[in-house]
Each structure stands twice: as C-alpha cells, then as structure tokens.
Regions:
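His/Asp/Glu-enriched, well-ordered alpha-helical/loop segment
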Residues: 1-89
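Short aromatic-centered micro-motifs
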Residues: 102
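Short, Lys/Arg- and Gly-enriched loop/turn segments at beta-strand edges
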Residues: 89-95
Length: 113
C-alpha cells in the first residue's frame, strides 16, 4: 500500500509540475494487455484529464521516445495503428479498456468479446 501511495503522489507531482508523461512500460513484470488500465489510473490517481491521459499514451509517448516523426498522431505520412472503443473516452476514460478492434497496417483485428 505504501508503494501505491508513493506512485499516486509521484504522478500528482509530475502532473502539477507539467512533467511530460508517457503511458506504457517495457518492464517485464507488468502483464501485457493491461496497459489500457493506465489511462484510468492517470485520471483517477494523477488528476489528469481524459485527453491528457490519451496524449500520454500517443503523442507524448512517441515524442519522448524520439519516434514522433513516424508515429504518435493521426497525420498524413505517419504510421497509424488505431484502436476503436465503444464510447467516448473523453466522457468515460474507462472506455479505453473496452477495445472493439485494432487497425494495424490497414488490417482490422476485432476482439472476441
């Protein structure tokens, strides 16, 4: 519990001080497929707006990794992998966890649920 409280405090400090935040991990200890929950945590724990959490997972992540010339936004000439969710994540950020399909390289992959 102390570690979770420390993480919450760190996120709030970073948000309050306008530190650029990228959503995601390359840590082997975090189960793959749960990253969408980070959008929710950034809003609930960090006080981000839903849009700020989405930016953290898209354009901020690309920029902070040095890949923003190729990805991170829906811009002509950039690579685009797109996720679709059933509702507006700006109204309910938990919609980011309800992916209905992913489009990668122009091919649509639908979820089974």
């Amino acid at each position: 519990l102390a570690a979770a409280a420390a993480v919450r405090h760190a996120i709030k400090l970073a948000v309050a001080n306008q530190v650029p935040i990228a959503l995601g991990t390359d840590a082997g200890v975090v189960p793959h497929g749960t990253n969408a929950h980070e959008f929710v945590l950034m809003v609930q724990w960090g006080g981000m707006t839903p849009m700020d959490s989405i930016v953290a997972g898209t354009s901020n992540a690309a920029r902070l990794l040095g890949w923003d010339k190729n990805l991170g936004s829906l811009t002509t000439g950039k690579w685009a992998d797109i996720v679709a969710v059933p509702g507006n994540p700006l109204q309910d950020i938990e919609n980011m966890q309800k992916v209905t399909f992913v489009m990668k390289n122009g091919v649509v992959y639908r979820t089974s649920n």
